[in-house]
Amino acid sequence: MEVTEQMAATLAQNAVTHFWQVREAQAVKQRNSGKADQGFRGAVTGGAQMNGFIEAFVKLANIAGVPEEAVYTKSRFLELPGYFRPTKEWDLLIVLEGVLLAAIEAKSQVGPSFGNNFNNRIEEAMGSALDLWTAFREKAYKRTVRPWLGYIFLLE
């Protein structure tokens, strides 16, 4: 099966819809709990907002012929060795026959404190990439193929 522009648009639209639905549900849950939280924090501390994007990547990997057992998500082991830190947990890994093919991280940035939070996200992405590439260079991974490293950011 080939990924069409319409299919990609639908996957992206569903992922964005999932993001906002989860965020709203978490905000409602926080309000109903009676516990006070700062600003929009209650809508984001529950996690899972970006799962729609991870599910979209899983579907794309399956369409591309990647076996289901080679795709690891939050429900499965996701830690990779680093160089500057012992390990890093990713949102999605593709590991086929012991070879890392891809690592993907999904992050979002919503709300009024765009500058500082966005800067933190960029530093995190750059640091994680440098850590993985240095570990790869220093032979922490099988070197049969250079893995694909991806970050997806959802910005409001």
Regions found by a protein language model. Name each.
Residues S75-D91:
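Charged, often glycine-rich, active-site loop that binds/positions anionic groups
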Residues M1-K74, L80:
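Interdomain/boundary linker segments immediately adjacent to catalytic/signaling cores
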Residues S108-E156:
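Catalytic cores of nucleic-acid endonucleases
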Residues P86, L93-A103:
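Active-site beta-strand-loop-beta-strand hairpin of nuclease catalytic cores
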Residues T45-G47, P86-T87, T144-L149:
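Glycine-rich, flexible loop segments associated with nucleotide phosphate handling
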Residues D91, L101, P147-L149:
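Conserved acidic residues
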